[in-house]
Amino acid sequence: GTAKTQKVDAGTETDLYLPRIYWTQDANTLAFIRMNRLQNQLDIFHANATSGESKLIISETAKTYVDLDYNDDLQYLSDGKTFIRTSEQDGYKHIYHHNLDGTLIRQLTSGAWEVSSMVGIDEKAKKLYFISTETSPLERNFYVINLDGKGKKLLTPAKGTHTINMSADHKFFIDYYSTTDTPVKVTLNDATGKELKVLEDNQALKERMAGFALGKKEFFSFPTVDGTQLNGYIIKPADFDPNKKYPVLMYVYGGPGSQNVLNSWGGSRDFWHQQLAAEGIIVACVDNRGTGARGRDFKHSTYANLGKLETIDQIEGAKHFAKMPFVDPSRIGIWGWSYGGYM
């Protein structure tokens, strides 16, 4: 056949981004995303591949910014009539089902929690698989929901953090599961969540850890002066004595959409923090405003003002620790890497 280059009409404005291009199920329809320079407007277009003509399908605006990277989930279903996308337009990242012309069929998920990632769509069974923070912002669990928005079911009831790899036919999934004191356990499960086989239990590491006196990582939340609830953790020495006064080292990252306070295996950094705890230093961490898993307003509160609210919240954290009867308030330090170094 002959190849012909066809320019697509993306509008007359030149100061913009065209960050994503997708084929729909129709070989003659190309989808592309257009964003303005400020990234507070996201437009989805469908273009005719033969003529280059394009049509605006959906336009989403925000007072702050539209987070394309976090909502990079546009998927055209094989029925050729509909597509699925995610959006934070109602304040939390949720899943939406649209007709090809952009009209909304339904919002599939809703609530004061986030869909952290889409895992798969079983079109034959009309089921959609996703991971969310519904149980807690400190956890990640795997769910299935019908495309009619009904029958939502939790597939991974174990508390902690689940990362999922699902087979292309949606009959099986591999679950990478961990908590703050349990290293990653990998299991093969059927689509109902039933465990079929343990692929890795990290038994050797667990046995090795049993030989060390490790302090427990405790999660907590506290209100700041303006009433914002912040999540944190504290690691006390294994031989903790509540009558002693301990120094505290705060660990911070705190960048937009990030998260340090999470019920998952912490790896080598946690072991370093355990080493400090063994030396008699309490290690503590607070996820300030601007961090993730708490919804759009919490994450975007630092927009165009990086460093201000984050610093206030870390100071609030330090004051919170200073009030603890076993803390020496004259010996509170802080360290951070990258954005945490900037903090």
Descriptions of predicted regions:
Residues 12, 25, 34-36, 51, ...:
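Short, flexible loop/turn elements at secondary-structure junctions
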Residues 1-18, 47-72, 99-122, 132-135, ...:
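Multi-bladed beta-propeller domains
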Residues 43-45, 94-96, 141-143, 185-187:
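A short loop-to-beta-strand structural motif that recurs across blades of beta-propeller domains
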Residues 31-38, 45-48, 74-90, 108-109, ...:
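Beta-strand C-termini and the immediately following turn/loop, strongest in propeller blades
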Residues 33, 161-343:
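Serine-hydrolase catalytic core recognition
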Residues 3, 39, 92, 181, ...:
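Coil-to-beta-strand transition motifs
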Residues 22-25, 70-79, 120-124, 166-167:
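Structural signature of eukaryotic scaffold interfaces centered on beta-propeller domains
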